């Protein structure tokens, strides 16, 4: 058994809604009541959010904040369109600035291109070079902060530029920035990795952040995944970051449709969050 907690447990705002807009105090009330250590704020509209208001909510309810975003439609780090490419880099730089203003030190997301964009071909060499060059420029901004920046590989149905841990490590090696790492999402990994636990061990200290859910996007622990062995792997890695429950509010039809949820995967979003947290904590503490 572990002697002291190294892992913190968070909940993603997709549990409630698609876009966090800054005034949803009920999110903080729920997360605190459910027993989470923190909240992962997800939005494309961070330019319109008051950082001081966000900080005040976190302080009022005693929960820490992490931040998640992705490139909006029309942007891309793999494009040959110079204006689009520059605008995409600028978007990520603004996200970094927003995190600084909020006192957030963990920024994560699927950044190479918008979620769901597929080119119809595997990642081309010129696109890979373009992506690496973009992250090198982002790293120039990143190293002036205390922020950890985690890039998420997506499954093949939602992205084509980064699908596996191996591809992610190749990107990190090319960029060579200690503040750049990987967000590893169990849903995507259960599709793309032949051995999820081996992939985590391969990522090792390059794993900066984790999204957890069952294989069907449901409650952690309600599936056949080897959760106990997985937590042992995290201990082997000496992982000390966040394990954040990410699933999607089925009642938010735009969000559910985007995640291809055609049926409920838990009795309720509250049950998914609470039962998932209870299971994760208990499994972590007994391994």
Curated annotation (Swiss-Prot):
Active site: 152, 246
Keyword set includes Manganese: yes
Residues involved in substrate binding: 188, 217
Matching InterPro entries: Sugar_Epim/Isomerase, Xyl_isomerase-like_sf, Xyl_isomerase-like_TIM-brl
Enzyme Commission designation: 5.1.3.-
Cofactor binding note of this UniProt entry: Binds 1 Mn(2+) ion per subunit.
CC cofactor: Mn(2+)
Keywords: Carbohydrate metabolism, Isomerase, Manganese, Metal-binding
A Pfam entry, by short name: AP_endonuc_2
Ligand binding (Mn(2+)): 152, 185, 211, 246
Signal peptide coordinates: none
Gene Ontology molecular function, alphabetical: isomerase activity; metal ion binding
Family indicated by similarity: Belongs to the hyi family.
Role played: Probably catalyzes the epimerization of ketopentoses and/or ketohexoses at the C3 position.
PANTHER family: 3-DEHYDRO-D-GULOSIDE 4-EPIMERASE-RELATED (PTHR43489:SF7), ISOMERASE (PTHR43489)
Identification of the protein by name: Probable ketose 3-epimerase
């Amino acid at each position: 058994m572990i002697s002291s907690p190294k892992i913190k447990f968070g909940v993603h705002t997709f549990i409630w809604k698609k876009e966090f807009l800054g005034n949803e105090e009920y999110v903080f009330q729920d997360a605190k009541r459910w027993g989470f250590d923190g909240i992962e704020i997800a939005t494309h509209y961070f330019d319109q959010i008051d950082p001081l208001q966000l900080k005040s909510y976190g302080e009022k309810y005693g929960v820490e904040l992490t931040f998640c975003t992705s490139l909006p439609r029309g942007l891309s780090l793999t494009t040959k369109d110079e204006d689009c490419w520059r605008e995409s880099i600028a978007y990520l730089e603004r996200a970094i600035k927003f995190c600084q203003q909020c006192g957030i030190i963990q920024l994560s997301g699927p950044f190479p291109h918008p979620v769901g964009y597929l080119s119809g071909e595997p990642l081309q060499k010129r696109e890979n070079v373009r992506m690496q060059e973009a992250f090198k420029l982002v790293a120039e901004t990143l190293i002036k902060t205390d922020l950890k920046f985690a890039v998420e590989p997506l499954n093949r149905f939602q992205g084509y530029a980064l699908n596996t841990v191996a591809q992610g490590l190749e990107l990190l090696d090319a960029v060579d920035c200690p503040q750049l790492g990987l967000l590893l999402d169990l849903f995507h990994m259960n599709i793309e990795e032949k051995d999820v636990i081996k992939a985590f061990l391969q990522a090792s200290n390059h794993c900066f952040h984790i999204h957890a859910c069952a294989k069907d996007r449901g409650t952690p622990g309600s599936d056949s995944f080897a959760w106990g062995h997985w937590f042992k792997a995290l201990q082997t890695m000496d992982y000390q970051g966040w394990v954040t429950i990410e699933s999607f509010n089925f009642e938010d039809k735009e969000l559910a449709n985007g995640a291809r949820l055609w049926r409920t995967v838990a009795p309720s979003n509250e049950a998914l969050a609470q039962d998932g947290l209870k299971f994760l904590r208990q499994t972590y503490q007994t391994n």
